[in-house]
């Protein structure tokens, strides 16, 4: 819903929407020129070739001739679809089609790239390629990425995260801020006996070759180690994950990118 409102496909019930300081109602034409959008469902024309889809899209922004060829070559190389240019979109796999969707959205060098669950259902290799390319363009073209996702490892890479549950904002902040508020730290310790771990009187779980201890924060972890130096010859401290944040905020878990 949020993305459809931002793109002008749905009318908001109330309030005002500003994108890059521009009012959505007053400056829609400008905003549309500055946005690149990858919807959850592909908007490519299945009857046309990859080349024709991208050529027609580029023409809407006045990108023709050598400018079109140069941008096409750049995107085809980075997103690895040069061999697909003559293929009909309807014959592409899901991962191939998603790469073309992203190329379509990036063609006019948008200031803001909107991604609506762009990697759902994709294999790990394609997901990694897509994020490598997007991260590269974000830096080289000074582009903002607005992402909706159920994959918390993707949210962990964001500069700012908003968790929405049942249509309302439940929590927001940087990944580090959210982890500090909603999760603790973990100490993974190796080469010790369970009786020594029990003597610490803190929550723990047995893992392969060691134990994982739960502590409120990094300060508590440091104090525990200082008090018991004889136990901590081989250990590591890690923060909770964004999955832990999501569970703490919403009471729900995410399995395979979907709520459960």
Regions found by a protein language model. Give the residues of each.
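Conserved ABC transporter NBD signature motif
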Residues: 15-23, 31
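Conserved ABC ATPase "signature" region
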Residues: 55, 59, 66-84
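Conserved ABC ATPase signature
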Residues: 88-92
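Conserved catalytic motifs of ABC-family nucleotide-binding domains
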Residues: 109
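Catalytic Walker B motif of ABC-type/P-loop ATPase nucleotide-binding domains
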Residues: 113-116
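Short, charged/small-residue-rich alpha-helical element at the C-terminal edge
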Residues: 183-253
């Amino acid at each position: 819903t949020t993305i459809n409102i931002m793109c002008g496909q749905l009318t908001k019930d109330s309030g005002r929407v500003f994108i890059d300081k521009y009012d959505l109602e007053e400056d829609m034409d400008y905003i549309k020129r500055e946005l690149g959008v990858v919807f959850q469902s592909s908007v490519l024309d299945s009857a046309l070739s990859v080349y024709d889809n991208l050529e027609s899209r580029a023409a809407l922004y006045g990108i023709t001739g050598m400018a079109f060829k140069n941008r096409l070559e750049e995107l085809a190389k980075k997103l690895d679809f040069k061999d697909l240019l003559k293929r009909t979109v309807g014959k592409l796999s899901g991962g191939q089609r998603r790469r073309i969707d992203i190329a379509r959205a990036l063609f006019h060098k948008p200031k803001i790239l909107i991604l609506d669950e762009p990697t759902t259902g994709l294999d790990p290799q394609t997901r990694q390629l897509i994020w490598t390319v997007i991260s590269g363009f974000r830096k080289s073209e000074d582009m903002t990425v607005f992402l909706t996702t159920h994959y918390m490892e993707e949210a962990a890479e964001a500069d700012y995260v908003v968790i929405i549950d049942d249509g309302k904002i439940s929590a927001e902040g940087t990944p580090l801020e959210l982890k500090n508020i909603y999760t603790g730290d973990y100490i993974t310790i190796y080469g010790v006996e369970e009786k020594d771990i029990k003597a610490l009187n803190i929550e723990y779980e047995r893992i392969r070759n060691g134990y994982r201890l739960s502590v409120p924060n990094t300060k508590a972890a440091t104090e525990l180690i200082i008090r018991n130096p004889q136990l901590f010859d081989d250990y590591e401290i890690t923060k909770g994950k964004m999955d832990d944040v999501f569970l703490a905020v919403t009471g729900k878990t995410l399995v395979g990118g979907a709520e459960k």
